[in-house]
């Protein structure tokens, strides 16, 4: 009986030990991911401009969104936006700081008349989005500057011809002998632009299978590799490429099926390898969403419910063996259906020049429920669209900021009209690879290097040697004043360091901020403000830009496809068309907007008096007779708003102070209109 009891006790201890060991492994995964997340920027900044092409002498208006790096909701961590614009030679042409309120900053950049035509980059940095060890420049917006839009050809710059680059990517990371494998490939022209290719896989110089790219130079081929055989790929142009190393034993990790409800993976290992525990961890943007554990002998299938991931985006699955070593990795795009649906309805179909337009905007979630959203809208001539800039908030948040390298035409993967977009997305994830997480088992957690501040920081020094001892180990007062006369005070500590907080800057905003030491002149005080822009430049110049690209030849090809169809006998086949007049090239001039404003500012034009009546709008109609003017002072007059309704009145003088009202009308105000030539 004792032996049975002892045996039962030993088995119980072993069982508990295994359970605890497995639980410790899972806890280790959670801890490692959490510690790794703490060292990375907690914010992501997205920049939106009011258009893509600008003429010199005008303003660029922008809106910057500070987003939580995990949920992509608005973040309130950073309070100051550092913004600068770089030219094609990477020289700074503009830099400024803007306040961030509730995660949003907006403002404008003046495009100087002396700017040279070309491509420029607008870059944004915040305290919690840009660290001193940031690997790539993420928060940017490429724009184009021209002297006059009428002289812009719209054609792309000629790219230098470079040797074809052909890369191979085994699914899961490695090719293992005897295990079915999928090999993704990607072909580019060396500038990052895709090249369609086709070729043949040779085994021991015998053709085994043919293949060709299916989207943007990317494709996939399947085979089972063996040790001791010679493998190579030959493209149609005759160039030959070797395959990655084939391992004699190991594991393979493949995505078998994927739909809205779940993802099914298959894990395989070489025959004869002992059975072992494996762990599959799923995370999204640094947050662990699920961990699965199983026993692997030869093959193991694991199903992961898609509902484990709360957001749309890239899910990273990492496979660990029984010793908690990462073996393979696979990226999967989940919940593409989780998106906002925005509908815009105009109050009418056609408008005359300078007529007021009313929009009704409705925003719903993927379930059709109305939700509150922070939106931006800009209206401009479509000639100012930059076809070379394919970036938008979806591509920036879900792709560009999440995977390595430069992505060509990322908007393709979010356009529901592209029926193969999810298959193309899977190819992209197989070839681009993961960007940012490094497993750190057994090492101290790393915390990223924050160096920017939201405040104005500086130091006060005393130049007088005689008086310097009097200020040692004491705090000194500094006055902070705004342009409108508002002032406040801050203290410099015993070392002379001081900060002007964001709340104080908000109270005195409206122009320049002036700082004045309160020490008398005999101390010879001097204030030095820390300028973080030079430090930003020293960091960003060593970082590659991963801004997405667009092949303009594809854009031009699409424009050609939109043109009328030409038959074999050179006649143009048209749908039913009603010709009303001879078409004319639109007249555009960079100064017209400015002239329109000047015309509307004409001092002799209509105005709204202090009582709210419209004056000088229609001959014979005045809100007040000339012998009895408005009792409210003239400085209360205001400019009428286009499209608003106002009352106008027509009076008849009966003699003395007597008068009668002959007519009263409620009219819609429309400003004076001018022809383009005027």
How should each PLM-predicted stretch be described?
Residues 38, 55, 76, 112-117, ...:
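Surface-exposed, low-complexity/disordered segments
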């Amino acid at each position: 009986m004792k032996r049975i009891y002892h045996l039962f006790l030993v088995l119980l201890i072993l069982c508990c030990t295994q359970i605890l060991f497995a639980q410790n492994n899972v806890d280790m995964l959670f801890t490692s991911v959490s510690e790794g997340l703490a060292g990375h920027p907690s914010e992501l900044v997205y920049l939106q401009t009011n258009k893509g092409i600008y003429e010199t002498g005008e303003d660029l208006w922008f809106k910057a969104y500070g987003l939580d790096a995990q949920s992509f909701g608005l973040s309130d961590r950073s309070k100051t936006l550092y913004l600068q614009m770089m030219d094609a030679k990477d020289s700074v042409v503009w830099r400024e700081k803007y306040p961030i309120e509730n995660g949003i900053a907006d403002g404008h950049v003046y495009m100087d008349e002396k700017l040279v035509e070309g491509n420029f980059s607008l870059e944004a940095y915040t305290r919690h989005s840009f660290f001193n060890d940031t690997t790539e420049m993420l928060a940017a917006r490429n724009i184009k500057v021209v002297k006059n839009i009428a002289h812009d050809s719209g054609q792309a710059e000629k790219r230098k011809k470079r040797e074809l680059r052909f890369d191979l990517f085994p699914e899961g990371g490695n090719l293992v002998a005897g295990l079915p494998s999928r090999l993704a490939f990607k072909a580019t022209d060396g500038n990052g632009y895709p090249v369609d290719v086709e070729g043949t896989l040779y085994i021991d110089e015998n053709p085994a299978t043919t293949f060709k790219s299916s989207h943007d130079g990317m494709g996939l081929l399947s085979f089972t590799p063996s040790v001791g055989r010679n493998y190579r790929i030959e493209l149609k142009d005759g160039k030959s490429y070797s395959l990655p190393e084939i391992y004699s034993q190991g594991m393979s990790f493949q995505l078998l099926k994927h739909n809205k409800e779940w993802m099914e993976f298959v894990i395989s290992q070489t025959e004869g390898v002992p059975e072992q525990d494996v762990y599959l961890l799923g995370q999204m943007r640094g947050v662990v969403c699920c961990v699965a554990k199983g026993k692997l002998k030869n093959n193991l299938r694991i199903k992961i419910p898609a509902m484990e991931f709360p957001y749309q985006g890239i899910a990273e699955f990492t496979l660990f063996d029984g010793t908690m070593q990462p073996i393979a990795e696979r990226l999967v795009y989940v919940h593409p259906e989780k998106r906002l649906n925005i509908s815009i309805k105009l109050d009418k179909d056609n408008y005359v020049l300078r007529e007021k337009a009313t929009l009704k905007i409705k925003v719903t979630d993927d379930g059709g429920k109305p939700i509150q959203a922070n939106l931006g809208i800009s209206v401009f001539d479509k000639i100012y669209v930059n076809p070379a800039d394919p970036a938008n908030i979806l591509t920036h948040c879900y792709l560009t900021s999440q995977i390595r390298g430069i992505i060509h035409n990322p908007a393709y993967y979010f356009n529901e009209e592209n029926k193969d977009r999810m298959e193309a997305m899977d190819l992209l994830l197989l070839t681009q690879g993961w960007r940012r997480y490094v497993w750190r088992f057994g090492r101290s957690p790393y915390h990223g290097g924050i160096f920017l501040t939201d405040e104005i920081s500086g130091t006060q020094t005393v130049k007088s040697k005689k008086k310097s001892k009097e200020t040692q180990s004491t705090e000194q007062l500094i006055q902070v004043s705004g342009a409108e006369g508002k002032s406040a005070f801050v203290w410099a500590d015993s070392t002379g360091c001081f900060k002007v907080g964001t709340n104080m800057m908000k109270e005195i905003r409206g122009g320049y901020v002036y700082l004045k030491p309160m020490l008398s002149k005999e101390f010879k005080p001097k204030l030095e403000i820390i300028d973080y822009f030079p430090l930003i430049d020293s960091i960003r110049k060593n970082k590659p830009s991963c801004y997405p690209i667009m092949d303009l030849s594809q854009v031009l090809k699409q424009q050609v496809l939109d043109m009328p169809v030409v038959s074999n006998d050179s006649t143009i086949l048209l749908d039913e068309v009603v010709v009303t007049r001879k078409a004319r090239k639109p007249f555009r001039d960079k100064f017209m907007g400015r002239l329109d404003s000047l015309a509307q500012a004409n001092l002799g034009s209509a105005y709204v008096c202090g009582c709210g009546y419209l004056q000088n709008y229609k001959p014979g109609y005045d809100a007040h007779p000339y012998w009895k003017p408005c009792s409210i002072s003239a400085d209360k007059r205001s400019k009428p708003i286009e499209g608003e309704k106002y009352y106008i009145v027509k009076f008849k003088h009966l003699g003395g102070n007597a008068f009668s009202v002959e007519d009263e009308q409620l009219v819609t105000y429309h400003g004076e209109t001018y022809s383009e030539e005027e």
